[in-house]
């Protein structure tokens, strides 16, 4: 059971809030951080205005400015794919260095494209976790320095909360309650988001995330990093029914995921094939492997919708950019007359607009980060609790 700060506790620590429903469980601010915050930080009222979001959890350096009403004024992303491609995956030390080199320019460009000045900002939101420790520290320290210089509040938010918030960036009126699938390189989680804004964790991966399965599968197939988009492109030329890869649904009624067995099945399939067959059937291998992943994601998501009684589904995170997943979700949602939210591709992968959106909710709820806020590489979603 995750820690929960009830409204009464928040009222004592942060003053009365009119927006508790938007940020019900500030897990990442419970503990010693409360003890070191100044009285001014705890009780300072936030006057809604433009805010800057900063994201450095993995291999994208991103900054975004949201207007007073939450509209996205800019969304700048600098990718490190060229840095990590020759290693076949993210090298944490190189990621941290690249963030240091890029963060000031990315933030300045986000501000320039927004048409605002530093003096116009009223708050800063930064990814506090989960993610790579060194990468997170770059963003957290930069955000704290800006907040101190500009004399405006900062707030640390969960990367998972950012992905959840991205579902409402394009369509603020997307209905609640709904089921949210967060599917990325590091996470595969199903949540039930209540009308209050509170989330309940319905299921998660027991081993590898879907994005991890895509990346490792791409490596085995000899495709370039990042693996997800590479498999997506290759699969368009293949037959998704060519090879019967296993699909793990676990026990009946389970909303958890497991992709480790699928990776092993691909490995054994490739080992049993002559080299010329691997090359000749590369597209079929990619398409069949992809189908085994996305079919489970779709089936579990709609099972969660049925069991929860919701009539809406939001799918967010980097893997939500997969073209086959999007097509299957749209077909199923149409057939079952469900509302479906698939964020634009710019909001699927790691970005700072989603961090700013989650941070805006936190600031409206009265949350503030002290100046000794630290990165939390294992930070869970602070919107959610487990049941």
Question: Where would I find each of the regions flagged by the language model?
Answer:
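Conserved phosphate-binding/catalytic loops in two-lobed NTP-binding clefts
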Residues: 156-157, 313, 330-354
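Active-site neighborhood for divalent-cation/phosphate handling
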Residues: 129, 133-135, 143, 149-178, ...
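A short helix-loop
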Residues: 38-51, 57, 64, 74, ...
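Glycine-rich phosphate-binding/hydrolytic loop that grips phosphoryl groups
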Residues: 343-381
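Short glycine-rich phosphate-binding loop at a beta-alpha junction
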Residues: 118-127, 309-319
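A contiguous, well-structured pocket-lining segment that forms one wall/lid of small-molecule binding clefts
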Residues: 233-313, 322-336, 363, 383-387
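Intrinsically disordered, low-complexity segments enriched in serine/proline and basic residues
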Residues: 2-12, 24, 124
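N-terminal beta-alpha supersecondary unit
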Residues: 48-130, 159, 285
């Amino acid at each position: 059971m995750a820690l929960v700060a009830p409204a009464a506790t928040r009222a004592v620590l942060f003053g009365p809030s009119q927006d508790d429903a938007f940020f019900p469980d500030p897990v990442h601010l419970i503990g010693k951080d409360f003890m070191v915050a100044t009285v001014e930080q705890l009780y300072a009222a936030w006057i809604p205005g433009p805010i800057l979001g900063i994201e450095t959890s993995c291999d994208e350096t991103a900054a975004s400015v949201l207007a007073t009403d939450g509209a996205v004024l800019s969304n700048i992303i600098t990718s490190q794919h060229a840095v990590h491609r020759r290693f076949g995956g993210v090298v944490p030390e190189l990621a941290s260095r690249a963030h240091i080199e890029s963060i000031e320019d990315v933030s300045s460009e986000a501000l320039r494209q927004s048409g605002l000045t530093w003096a116009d900002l009223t708050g800063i939101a930064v990814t506090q976790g989960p993610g790579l420790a060194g990468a997170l520290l770059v963003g957290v320290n930069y955000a704290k320095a800006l907040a101190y210089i500009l004399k405006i509040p900062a707030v640390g938010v969960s990367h998972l909360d950012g992905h959840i918030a991205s579902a409402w960036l394009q369509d603020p009126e997307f209905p609640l309650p709904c089921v949210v699938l967060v599917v990325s390189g590091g996470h595969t989680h199903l949540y039930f988001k209540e009308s209050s804004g509170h989330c309940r964790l319905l299921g998660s991966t027991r081993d590898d995330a879907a994005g991890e399965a895509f990346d490792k599968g791409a490596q085995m197939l000899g495709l370039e990093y990042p693996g997800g988009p590479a498999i997506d492109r290759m699969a368009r030329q293949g037959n998704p029914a060519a090879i019967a890869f296993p699909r793990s649904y676990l026990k009946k009624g389970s909303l958890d995921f497991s992709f480790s067995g699928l990776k092993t099945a691909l490995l054994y399939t490739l080992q049993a094939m002559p080299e010329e067959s691997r090359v000749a059937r590369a597209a079929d291998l990619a398409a069949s492997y992809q189908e085994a992943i996305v079919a489970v994601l779709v089936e579990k998501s709609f099972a969660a919708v049925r069991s929860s009684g919701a009539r809406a589904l939001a799918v967010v995170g980097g893997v939500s950019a997969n073209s086959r997943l999007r097509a299957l979700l749209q077909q199923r949602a149409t057939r079952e007359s469900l509302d479906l939210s698939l964020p634009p591709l710019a909001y699927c992968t790691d970005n700072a607009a989603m961090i700013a959106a989650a941070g805006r909710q936190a600031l409206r709820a009265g949350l503030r980060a002290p100046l000794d806020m630290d990165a939390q590489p294992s930070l869970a979603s602070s919107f959610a609790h487990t049941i």
